[in-house]
């Protein structure tokens, strides 16, 4: 799988204006900043991108803007999963037409679908496109846990399922995926605090919302691992870990946008019903960013 996607992929936040409209100018700036910091790829319209609050038309427009602004500099893997197979197929085909490298697809959610129904959904959506598919396991949101065994069945049944993003937070499951299926699919881990552990275990990379805030720092950890400099990787990760822990402690997207605001790169508010990060967590974020060399008081990014 020499040509497979790998590295640090940003789970791109969707900037909104004060009126909660998609801020295309802010989105373009975010894409440029992230790519300039060395990120390896972009995943728009995922959970961090607040896809559940976007209309299908808005999701398509965000994908168009991201692919246009990336301009071939890095791969773009839009999330195209939806509650219905019909909508997921429409979004997936649009992403392929627009120039996506691959698509990421979460399991259908809200209704408690069976494993058989979920597998059929994946087969139908993947079969509607010719580009690779990344299965997105997010059991806390979907109510369906794509265990290594279930994913193994999907991998054997869906020819273009080439990637898995595991955001279960279950490291043992991620490790099983890596060791049992890593020669067939590339495994990305999406739980921020497991970033280094997953890389050391052999993950292809990570799709991570923290890349909206500290893209360069995450790439530095990844590069150290790739170079075999584990001492440096652990040193860099030790500094980053408090910020990662603050992100996953609750209200993830609010924390990401709060941190973006603190460093002077505002993503705007969460779209309703999401709210801003509370003052206590904002202070924790502020202190974590200060320890990394940022100056949140001045809203200045000290280092990429």
Locate predicted features:
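Active-site beta->alpha loop and helix N-cap motifs at the rims of alpha/beta catalytic domains
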Residues: 2-145, 153
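C-terminal alpha-helical cap/extension of soluble enzyme domains
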Residues: 2-15, 33, 37-39, 48, ...
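A general structural signal for well-ordered alpha-helical segments in protein cores
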Residues: 5, 27, 59, 63, ...
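A generic secondary-structure micro-motif detector
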Residues: 20, 52, 81, 184-185, ...
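Residue-level signature of catalytic and energy-coupling elements of molecular machines
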Residues: 20, 164, 285
């Amino acid at each position: 799988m020499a040509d497979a996607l790998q590295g640090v992929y940003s789970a791109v936040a969707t900037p909104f204006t004060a009126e909660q409209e998609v801020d295309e100018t802010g989105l373009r700036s975010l894409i440029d900043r992230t790519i300039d910091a060395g990120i390896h790829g972009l995943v728009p319209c995922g959970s961090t991108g607040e896809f559940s609050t976007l209309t299908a038309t808005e999701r398509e427009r965000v994908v168009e803007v991201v692919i246009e602004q990336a301009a071939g500099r890095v791969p773009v893997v839009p999330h195209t999963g939806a509650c219905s197979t019909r909508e997921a197929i429409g979004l997936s085909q649009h992403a392929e037409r627009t120039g996506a490298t691959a698509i990421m697809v979460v399991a259908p959610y809200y209704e408690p679908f069976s494993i058989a129904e979920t597998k059929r959904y994946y087969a139908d959506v993947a079969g509607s496109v010719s580009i690779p598919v990344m299965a997105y396991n997010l059991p806390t949101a979907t109510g369906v846990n794509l265990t290594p065994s279930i994913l193994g069945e999907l991998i054997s049944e869906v020819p273009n399922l080439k990637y898995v993003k595991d955001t279960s937070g279950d490291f043992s499951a991620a490790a099983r995926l890596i060791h049992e299926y890593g020669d067939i699919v590339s495994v990305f881990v999406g739980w921020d605090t497991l970033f280094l552990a997953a890389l050391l275990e052999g993950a292809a990379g990570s799709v991570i919302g923290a890349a909206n805030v500290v893209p360069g720092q995450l790439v530095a950890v990844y590069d150290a691992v790739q170079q075999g400099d584990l001492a440096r990787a652990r040193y860099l990760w030790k500094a980053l870990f408090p910020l990662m822990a603050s992100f996953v402690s609750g209200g993830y997207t609010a924390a990401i946008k709060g941190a973006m605001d603190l460093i002077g790169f505002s993503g705007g508010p969460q779209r309703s019903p999401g709210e801003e990060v509370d003052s206590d967590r904002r202070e924790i974020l502020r202190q974590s960013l200060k320890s990394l060399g940022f100056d949140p008081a001045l809203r200045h990014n000290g280092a990429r």
